[in-house]
Each structure stands twice: as structure tokens, then as C-alpha cells.
From Swiss-Prot:
Pathway(s) this gene product operates in, as recorded in its UniProt entry: Metabolic intermediate biosynthesis; acetyl-CoA biosynthesis; acetyl-CoA from acetate: step 1/2
SUPFAM superfamilies named in the record: Actin-like ATPase domain
Record's keyword annotation contains Magnesium: yes
GO molecular function: acetate kinase activity; ATP binding; magnesium ion binding
Provenance organism: Streptococcus pyogenes serotype M12 (strain MGAS2096)
This protein's name: Acetate kinase
Pfam family, one: Acetate_kinase
GO process annotations (BP): acetate metabolic process; acetyl-CoA biosynthetic process
Positions of ATP binding: 15, 206-210, 283-285, 331-335
Catalytic activity line of the entry: acetate + ATP = acetyl phosphate + ADP
Entry binding sites for substrate: 89
E.C. number: 2.7.2.1
Co-factor binding comment: Mg(2+). Can also accept Mn(2+).
Residues reported to bind Mg(2+): 8, 383
High-level lineage: Bacteria, Bacillati, Bacillota, Bacilli, Lactobacillales
Length: 398
């Protein structure tokens, strides 16, 4: 019996979940937000209770100390040594990491070097890893990479149609992201369908603030929508998704506020997508409220969002030469029935049909009609559990 913490650290946040392993029982979960800012918020949920504190938390090391002290203070653990492993979500593993690994100094250095592939994510993950290693140096730390699942893509899929020297010299290629989520929901879909994963062709749609769609052939990723960075693919909450790359130098020439490529990429990452087009929010709930009010910018943002997702799903039907099921997961994928309805409404030619009585908020499972040739599933993702499982598997290999 051991306890494992799954960590998802961002630049100013640290989301966590504590498991009793190998039973896979969730003992507590929480999030520390606004790290490095005034009025940081630490939230802990356990035994049906919710504790919230407003603090000044200056960095990730301080955040980890507060998290561990809270676990003792609220009686969730009696001592630090009850924790035998920590698993960290890392977005970009590049070509270096094809599977989860135990952290050492070299691994941490490589994660920091790979920040160029995920500038919004890897630096925060590295800070979280460093903090846990400083405070709990004797326990096993494991990195679980979003990109690992996509290392099964063929070369003709992951290479861009540019001179090959940019791949050879600079490793410019498609890496993908959200791999842990795509892997988990594909496994769960196979259970739900009562068929071996090795026989299935699945399209998995992770639709949250970040959006990625993956073509899964017999349990392996054969294509995915995110690319060299998580900026590629369909429209997202604050990210543009795919655009004509010639727009970048054009905007630098035209807009004095955009001084260089970094400014444009920052705009595409943080000020675009649903938020940028609507001028309202990156949250689909706010966009849907705008639809009810006939707000033209909300309508436009919503229509672009649906259009881009439909196109991406459609191309993966071609990649797989048909599919057995389409899986919706993540925040919007699980909780936005209107979005699911409108996406499927544009894909009926592929043989999909959903039951409106099942396509409602809170429902999980098969939402397709009995006649639907392609099953439509809503499955809650559980990246934290995948991380905890990998820690359990690797903690004795240090």
C-alpha cells in the first residue's frame, strides 16, 4: 500500500491528485492557483469537504511545501514518508522520450531544453519537478509525456513538407499533445464497446481549452492535430489553431504592437480562438450564453469552432478509411451537448447519429442511436490516473 501524487504544474498553477495505490483510490485532490501573484488560492478537496485558503505563494517550491503541509494538517496523511511516488505531466518530450521515465538531473535538463516545443507548459512542469525533488529527494519522481503516445506516427505523417534539413538539424516535425488523454479514452472506449482495442479504429476528440483530435488505429496514434507545438489544429479556447504561416510576417509589418514573431505567436496562443474572435471569453458556457443573446461575435466564434472541428474529424475518417467510434472527452467534449450535436450534425454522411435524450449535460457513455454505424461515445478522461499508474509501474526501477 502506497500513496502517489499526480501533478500537473503550469507556469502559475499546480493541480494535484493523491491516490492510494495500487487500489487507485482518490484520497484527495486540489489546485494551487496564482503562484507568483498576490492572493494565491490553495484548494483541497477530501472526504466530501472543501478547504480553501488565500495565501501569498511566491514560487513552485513554496506551493509544494503548502500542498504537503495541507495533506498533514487535514489528516490526509500522517507523514511525508507515506508518499512513495510523484508523477508529473510534461507536455513536450520531443523525440527524446518515447515513454514515461524516472526523473534524474539529465532528464530535468532535457525537459527544460524542450520548452521551445511547449513554451506555455514545459517551464511550469520543470519548476514543479524541481520543487518536489528539492523537498522530497528520496521518493521516485516520474515524468509522463503528452507526446509519447504519438511517437507511433509514421515519418510521412509527422514530417512537414519543407526541406528535410529543418528536421535533420532542428527536429522540426509534428509531435502532438494530449497523448495521455487520447490513450486513456481509447482504452475505455474499447471496454465500452466490448471489443479488443487492437481491432478498433477510433477518432478521439479532446476538446477543452486546448483542442486536439487523434486517429487511433488498433491502439496506436497514427495522426493527431497538434503539431510542432500545441498551437496547431482546430480553433481552441485562446489559441488560433492552424493559420496560413504567411500571416505572421504580414502582421509584424502591419501592426506596430506586434514587434516580432514572438509577439505574434503570443497573440496566437493567448489572445485568439474563441476568446479572440468573440471578444467575450474562452469558456464555451459564455459563448453559448452569447448565442442565446444573438451576439453576432459569439455566433461567429462558435461557427468557426464547429467548422474547424468537423473538418479535422472528417480528415481522420479518411486517414483511417472509416472508424468504429468517435469519442468526445475533456471539458467541452464531456460537458457541451450543443457543441456535440452541431459537430455530429455535419458528419451524418459518415453514418453517425446521436440520441438527443442521451446527448445531455452529465451523461457519460454511448450517445449514438442503435442505427448509428459509427458509435459516438462520451468518456471522462483521467490523465491523473494514467500518471499514477506509470509511477506505480516505474517506481522500483530507479
Amino acid at each position: 500500500m502506497s500513496k502517489t501524487i499526480a501533478i500537473n504544474a503550469g507556469s502559475s498553477s499546480l493541480k494535484w491528485q493523491l491516490y492510494q495505490m495500487p487500489e487507485e483510490e482518490v484520497l484527495a485532490q486540489g489546485i494551487i492557483e496564482r503562484i507568483g501573484l498576490k492572493d494565491s488560492i490553495s484548494t483541497v478537496k477530501y472526504d466530501g469537504k472543501k478547504e480553501e485558503q488565500i495565501l501569498d505563494i511566491h514560487d513552485h517550491t513554496e506551493a509544494v511545501k503548502i500542498l504537503l503541509n495541507d495533506l498533514i494538517h487535514f489528516g490526509i496523511i500522517a507523514a511525508y514518508d507515506e508518499i512513495t511516488g510523484v508523477g508529473h505531466r510534461v507536455v513536450a518530450g520531443g523525440e527524446l522520450f518515447k515513454e514515461s521515465v524516472v526523473v534524474n538531473d539529465k532528464v530535468l535538463e532535457q525537459i527544460e531544453e524542450l520548452s521551445v516545443l511547449a513554451p506555455l507548459h514545459n517551464p511550469g512542469a520543470a519548476a514543479g519537478i524541481r520543487a518536489f525533488r528539492d523537498i522530497l529527494p528520496d521518493i521516485t519522481s516520474v515524468c509522463v509525456f503528452d507526446t509519447s503516445f504519438h511517437t507511433s506516427m509514421a515519418k510521412h505523417t509527422y514530417l512537414y513538407p519543407i526541406p528535410q534539413k529543418y528536421y535533420t538539424d532542428y527536429k522540426v516535425r509534428k509531435y502532438g499533445a494530449h497523448g495521455t488523454s487520447h490513450k486513456y479514452v481509447a482504452q475505455e472506449a474499447a471496454k465500452m464497446l466490448g471489443r479488443p482495442l487492437e481491432e478498433l479504429k477510433l477518432i478521439t476528440a479532446h476538446i477543452g481549452n486546448g483542442v486536439s483530435i487523434t486517429a487511433n488505429y488498433h491502439g496506436k496514434s497514427v495522426d493527431t492535430s497538434m503539431g510542432f507545438t500545441p498551437l496547431a489544429g482546430p480553433m481552441m479556447g485562446t489559441r488560433s489553431g492552424d493559420i496560413d504561416p504567411a500571416i505572421i510576417p504580414y502582421l509584424i509589418e502591419q501592426d506596430p504592437e506586434l514587434k516580432d514573431a514572438a509577439d505574434v505567436v503570443n497573440m496566437l496562443n493567448k489572445k485568439s480562438g474563441l476568446s479572440g474572435v468573440s471578444g467575450i471569453s474562452s469558456d464555451m458556457r459564455d459563448i453559448e450564453a452569447g448565442l442565446q443573446e444573438d451576439n453576432p461575435d459569439a455566433v461567429l466564434a462558435y461557427n468557426i469552432f464547429i467548422d474547424r472541428i468537423k473538418k479535422c474529424i472528417g480528415q481522420y475518417f479518411a486517414v483511417l478509411n472509416g472508424a468504429d467510434a468517435l469519442v468526445f472527452t475533456a471539458g467541452m467534449g464531456e460537458n457541451a451537448p450543443l457543441m456535440r450535436q452541431d459537430v455530429i450534425g455535419g458528419l451524418t454522411w459518415f453514418g453517425m447519429d446521436i440520441d438527443p435524450e442521451k446527448n445531455v449535460f452529465g451523461y457519460r457513455g454511448d450517445i449514438s442511436t442503435p442505427e448509428s454505424k459509427v458509435k459516438v461515445l462520451v468518456i471522462s478522461t483521467d490523465e491523473e490516473l494514467c500518471i499514477a499508474r506509470d509511477v506505480e509501474r516505474l517506481k522500483n526501477t530507479k
